Amino acid sequence: MITPKNNKIIHWFFHRYILRLIDKNFRSFNYNNIAVDADKSVLLIPNHFSWWDGFILYYLNYKLFKKRFHIMILEETVSKVFFLKYMGAFSISKNSKGLIESLNYAAELLNDPQNLVVIFPQGKLYSNFVQQVDFDKGILRVIDKTQQKTQLIFSATFIEYFEHKKPGVNVYVNKSAVNSFNNIHQLTEAYQQHYEAARQQQTQIVI
């Protein structure tokens, strides 16, 4: 497993790079404010639809959560893009041993209230406006190990152009009412309710 590395110079450079990348490529970046407990870490569960996802959530953390950013990414991606590990990325492998190691590492990170961890339970890329969201069950291992120490936050991101040359980003976030789920179906349903409400709100935008 590839874990995050510390290098202040590299981190500073690519922090500025990511912020500029978002500002340059999107005409707007909108999100709703929610109360965040400073004494608890954040487990952020988003939808997964594009190459931009990690950068968008990094930007969201910078603007809203203000925690130390970490994100679980496929091992081949972390290996290929050298700077990701300096920006909080850690790898996950699809083999069972590597999978458990990465999930346990995510749980360890969440023991620190200053940390935020992003996990994409969908596991694959889907359409930005897919109706039904399905999760892999591995995320439950992280939640079960950290439910008293972290706050579970759902996010749903939508990108649209309307009449503009550049698209706008809308991120809808909501804190889960509970941090314990008996099975993956309960977690998926809880996220689905947030996602559907966000999708309906997004599709009601008329220019």
Spans of features found by a protein language model:
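Flexible, charged surface loops at secondary-structure boundaries
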Residues: I34-D39, F65-K66, L110-P113
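Non-catalytic C-terminal accessory region of glycerolipid acyltransferases
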Residues: I2, L103-I207
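Glycine-rich, highly charged phosphate/nucleotide-binding loops
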Residues: N25-N30, K97-Y105
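Soluble or luminal CAZymes and related metallo-dependent hydrolases
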Residues: I9-F14, K97-S102, F135
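Helix-to-loop junction immediately C-terminal to a conserved catalytic motif
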Residues: W12-H48
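Alpha-helical membrane-targeting segments
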Residues: M1-F26, S79-M87
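Catalytic core of membrane glycerolipid acyltransferases/transacylases, capturing the structured
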Residues: K40-S96
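Short, flexible loop segments at the rims of nucleotide/cofactor-binding pockets, characterized by
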Residues: I18-N25, S93-G98, F129-Q131
